[in-house]
């Protein structure tokens, strides 16, 4: 009915669309938005005005309350905080101590903190990393009195302040901040390194405070806005300045001959910008300051000539050392004793002999060479009798041991073994025994040392010590076996030492005859006891015909059981026995069997004669004894 009354709802319904359209267009400013809102307010007429105002008032109050609470939440939760729980969790993550005071390093970089707080319990910190955060102020570091390094680069700092508690601070990094003036650093008595790169420093007044930093050695002012060349007047008053970086500042272009000028004015500078200041560079810069480019060129030439001479002298000294070493080697080869270095004249090349020595340089070279040889002699002393070593002759070889042979010369006789004894291996009729003999002969060609000789318990039949050769006092046991009887047993016969008095003792020991080999390849060597029994048989026949009553009742070979043998050896030794004729052997010998002679008792003369005829044929018995011994094993 009334169109005016119907229009406000339409306009009010269209109001959000207007606001949305204004919000969608980013170019539309707040003035446009306010005009649209005012237009919509003007459209509210009649009875709807009060209703609209009543609706807008509570909505405005709610909006202000919501904005206040939202700003308060932003202030409280706008980023991570350095809470105690967070710090403990961080220490656990980095495998640090859970007890705060025990930690000396704390890594708080790249965490997004906007302020420094809750570090009161971390009193033992020596290094604190706070780089790459949003910190706007240096504060709350009163408990860190032991701090040495503080890293605050890449933050939002505008001022240097609150560093008085850090009396032991050595390195401070404030790069990539918004600091315009260097200040409040004189309270740090041991500050050694200050990094102020990428800040807002511009004038000499901004760095004037550096005059009070007496212990500062490393200063980085790169990539600032310093343009006044008078900054050098401030820098040259710093007594300990060694490293300076001014790269990225306009002042490097405003100072003529920048590097030479800075090097000359800063007397103790050792590193400028991106490279060191060498002594040669400083000397050339000072020469340039005195006489320009010509003086600099002359000074550079002198330095180059000195460096070249130094290299040449070192090469000559090395050549002299090599030459003297060759002379000493030749003198040793000729058998001459080389003179000590102090008595020697300086052997040089013909060119050096023609030229006189060059004073101090030559003396330095000589002293260097002498010191080199003295050091070599101390490390590797030469023995005067290095090539003269006493040796113990074994066949055609020598057992070389200088130290032992000198001590053994007074206590024992030298071990001398004839080549026949060394090369007399065990031989046999079969081919396998010959191969073993050749192998043994090859093994004996190796050098033998006294330390390699076995102990007395390890002596074989072929390896006998000196005591076995010189001392042979025990009662020998002779094992006699008939080689023609298949069922012959081991016989043990003990003879006194007086029986063997006339027999020469083999130098290889009492048991060496067991392993000795006969050199006669005839058939007689294959029957061990045939040659022994032949002379004894003839002597038996003669003695029987002369004195038949002297025949002994004891057999030639006495058979002993194992029990009797052990009892006899344990209780008392068997008495000496004389040979008697065996009936079986006698009958076989009378029947014309020359291989089985009979034995008869021998008198003193017959005994000596039999013994003298017995031992020349020992090699034939040794084979049989060896075979029986191996057979018993």
Swiss-Prot record:
Biased composition (Low complexity): 46-60, 413-427
Main location class: other
Modified residues (Phosphothreonine): 462
Keywords: Cell projection, Cilium, Leucine-rich repeat, Phosphoprotein, Repeat
LRR repeat intervals: 101-123, 124-145, 146-167, 168-189, 190-211, 215-236
GO molecular function annotation: dynein complex binding
Stored Pfam families: LRR_9 (PF14580)
Region described as Disordered: 1-80, 326-364, 404-436, 538-633
Keyword Calcium: no
Domain annotation LRRCT: ranges: 249-288
Basic and acidic residues bias (residue ranges): 22-42, 70-80, 326-344, 352-364
Functional description taken from the UniProt entry: Cilium-specific protein required for the stability of the ciliary architecture. Plays a role in cytoplasmic preassembly of dynein arms. Involved in regulation of microtubule-based cilia and actin-based brush border microvilli.
Name assigned to this protein: Dynein axonemal assembly factor 1
Taxonomic lineage of the native organism: Eukaryota, Metazoa, Chordata, Craniata, Vertebrata
């Amino acid at each position: 009915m009334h169109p005016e009354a119907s229009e406000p709802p339409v306009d009010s319904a269209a109001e959000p669309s207007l606001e949305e359209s204004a919000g969608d267009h980013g170019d539309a400013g707040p003035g446009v938005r306010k005009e649209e809102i005012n237009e919509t307010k003007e459209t509210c007429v009649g009875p709807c005005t009060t209703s609209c105002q009543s609706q807008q008032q509570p909505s405005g109050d709610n909006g202000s309350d919501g904005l206040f609470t939202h700003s308060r939440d932003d202030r409280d939760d706008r980023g991570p905080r350095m809470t105690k729980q967070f710090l403990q969790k961080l220490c656990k993550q980095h495998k640090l101590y859970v007890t705060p005071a025990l930690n000396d390093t704390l890594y708080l970089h790249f965490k997004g903190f906007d302020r420094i707080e809750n570090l009161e319990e971390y009193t033992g910190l020596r290094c604190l990393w706070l780089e790459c955060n949003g910190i706007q102020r240096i504060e709350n570091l009163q408990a860190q009195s032991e701090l040495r390094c503080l890293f605050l680069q890449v933050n939002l700092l505008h001022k240097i302040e609150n560093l008085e508690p850090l009396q032991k601070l050595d390195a401070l990094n404030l790069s990539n901040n918004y600091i315009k003036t260097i200040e409040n650093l004189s309270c740090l008595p041991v500050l050694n390194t200050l990094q102020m790169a990428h800040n807002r420093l511009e004038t000499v007044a901004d760095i004037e405070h550096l005059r009070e930093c007496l212990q500062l050695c490393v200063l980085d002012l790169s990539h600032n806005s310093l343009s006044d060349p008078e900054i050098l007047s401030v820098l040259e008053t710093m007594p300990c300045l060694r490293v300076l970086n001014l790269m990225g500042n306009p002042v490097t272009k405003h100072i003529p001959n920048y590097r030479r000028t800075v090097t000359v004015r800063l007397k103790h500078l050792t590193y400028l910008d991106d490279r060191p200041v060498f002594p040669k560079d400083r000397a050339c810069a000072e020469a340039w300051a005195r006489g320009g480019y010509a003086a600099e060129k002359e000074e550079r030439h002198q330095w180059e000539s000195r460096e070249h001479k130094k290299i040449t002298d070192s090469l000559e000294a090395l050549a002299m050392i090599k030459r003297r070493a060759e002379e000493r080697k030749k003198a040793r080869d000729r058998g001459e004793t080389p003179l000590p270095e102090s008595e020697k004249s300086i052997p040089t090349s013909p060119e050096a002999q023609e030229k006189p020595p060059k004073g101090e340089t030559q003396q330095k070279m000589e002293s260097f060479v002498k010191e080199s040889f003295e050091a070599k002699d101390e490390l590797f002393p030469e023995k005067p009798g290095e090539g003269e070593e006493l040796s113990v002759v074994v066949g055609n070889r020598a057992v070389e041991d200088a130290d032992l042979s000198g001590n053994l010369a007074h206590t024992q006789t030298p071990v001398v073994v004839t080549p026949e004894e060394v090369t007399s291996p065990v031989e046999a009729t079969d081919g396998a025994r010959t191969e073993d003999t050749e192998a043994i002969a090859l093994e004996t060609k190796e050098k033998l040392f006294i330390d390699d000789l076995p102990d007395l318990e390890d002596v074989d039949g072929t390896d006998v010590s000196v005591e076995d050769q010189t001392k042979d006092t025990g009662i020998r046991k002779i094992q006699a076996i008939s080689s023609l009887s298949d069922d012959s047993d081991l016989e043990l016969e003990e003879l006194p030492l007086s029986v063997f008095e006339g027999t020469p003792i083999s130098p290889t020991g009492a048991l060496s005859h067991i392993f000795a080999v006969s050199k006669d390849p005839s058939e007689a060597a294959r029957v061990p006891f045939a040659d022994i029994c032949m002379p004894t048989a003839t002597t038996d026949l003669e003695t029987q015909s002369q004195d038949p009553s002297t025949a002994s009742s004891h057999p030639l070979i006495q058979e002993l059981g194992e029990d009797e043998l052990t009892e006899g050896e344990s209780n008392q030794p068997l008495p000496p026995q004389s040979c008697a004729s065996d009936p079986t052997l006698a009958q076989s010998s009378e029947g014309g069997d020359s291989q089985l002679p009979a034995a008869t008792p021998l008198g003193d003369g017959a005994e000596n004669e039999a013994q003298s005829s017995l031992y020349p044929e020992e090699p034939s018995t040794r084979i049989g004894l060896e075979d029986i011994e191996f057979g018993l094993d």
